[in-house]
Amino acid sequence: MYAVIKTGGKQYKVAKGDSVFVEKLEVKPGDEVTFDEVILVNDGKSTKIGTPVVEGAKVVAKVEKQGKEKKVVTFKYKPKKHSHTKYGHRQPYTKVTIESIEA
């Protein structure tokens, strides 16, 4: 059984026991979070596709940790002008483990 959920403006294909890195959620590690925006559910026999979401479906997950991804460095320069700028960015994430899919 798997489902497609939408969170943080992105879509993720998840199954029970999967660990997924999603955009940062304001929850503490160890808490449970419920994803109500389920776009698709497949139980092996049939597939339910939502319009836009599947009614009554939800995915329950446990928050494992909060963190930041590796640093992405951007370097801008203008040739012959002695002008350069270096930027760094670390995107925050939340790691969740899928506990159940209810359809």
Swiss-Prot record:
One of its GO terms (cellular component) is ribonucleoprotein complex. It comes from Lactobacillus johnsonii (strain CNCM I-12250 / La1 / NCC 533). PANTHER family: 50S RIBOSOMAL PROTEIN L21, LARGE RIBOSOMAL SUBUNIT PROTEIN BL21M. Keywords: Ribonucleoprotein, Ribosomal protein, RNA-binding, rRNA-binding. The keyword Transferase does not apply. GO terms for molecular function: rRNA binding; structural constituent of ribosome. This protein binds to 23S rRNA in the presence of protein L20. Belongs to the bacterial ribosomal protein bL21 family. InterPro entries: bL21-like (IPR028909), bL21-like_sf (IPR036164), Ribosomal_bL21 (IPR001787), Ribosomal_bL21_CS (IPR018258). Part of the 50S ribosomal subunit. Contacts protein L20. This is Large ribosomal subunit protein bL21. SUPFAM superfamilies: L21p-like. NCBIfam families: L21. GO terms for biological process: translation.
